[in-house]
Amino acid sequence: EGKNDKAEKVIALAMKNFPIDYYGIYITVEPFADLYYRLGKNKEAADIAIKLANKAIEDLKFYQGMGVTEQQENGYEIIQAFETIYRITANCKLNKDTATVAKLNGLVAPYEKIFARYLNAYKQQEQQQMEMMRKQQEMMRDTATQAVDSTQP
């Protein structure tokens, strides 16, 4: 609403107080990339996106160094790192930043191969949950239809 300069100052202050290199709760920083995109500051948005993705990649490198048993114990955290990268990539796609999307895809691709067993299991679990939700909705519709039918003479 014409207050782009003020918005940019607020974002800069937030980034100063929550520096990506030292602040471990990255999900709170992710929206700032989107805000920079909205302000037309694509370079700043891309910089945040790449920094956040690199933090998730650092986590994946850490898990890569573990044995299989330790990796299995940290499966949730491994998936969380991928979800972080996928959220960031989706935001860049939404803002039509194809160069950053390509860079992010290049960063994550090797780790998708390394952790394919976890990603495949996660995707399969998500598909099962979606199917269960679909069946529940179908049952609810059937129940509602039966209830309406039973009230009609």
State what each model feature region is:
Residues 1-153:
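C-terminal luminal/periplasmic domains and tails of membrane-associated envelope-modifying transferases
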